[in-house]
Amino acid sequence: KICVIDGMVGYVGGVNLADEYINKKERFGHWKDTAVMLKGDAVQSLTMIFLQMWNVDERGVETYGRYLTPKREGLRRELGYIIPYADSPFDNENVGEEVYFHILNDEKKYVHIMTPYLIRDNEMLTTLIRAAKSGIEVIIIMPHIPDKWYAFVVAKTFYKELIQGGVQIYEYTPGFVHAKVFISDDD
């Protein structure tokens, strides 16, 4: 989910709009989610990701320049860069999956994953297990209370193989984890 305000501030992540998402009403226990607020040049990338999907089924050519703000000079960069990415309906590249493979194959200390829907192909299963067996701490946090029973059942079928391969799996018991988080080494 993407929300961009005047090209200056962007939000990405779990920004659902209903009482259950702010825990005013409980459908699946306590709802846990994440979102990130961005400012600066990274907001331009979020804007382009949003616009690429906007009216994707129409054949017209859109000029996006009117939605972009001028590049701002003088932003602090000593802490690093933020590069938003997304998969696209216009090609067969799985950008997100490739980023995850790169992280799992490159990290030295840990990879912590939080996801409500652990539905993985064999390549991802193998990569997760290989990372764990190489000494990287691989932790996956899943919901204990599902919102989609079929996705929950499918996810459970991977538990045994992952645990035997050294991956640690935990379930959030007070409610539902809707967050999609992939965190790796601090440096």
What are these model-derived regions, one by one?
Residues K1-D187:
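Charged, low-complexity intrinsically disordered terminal segments
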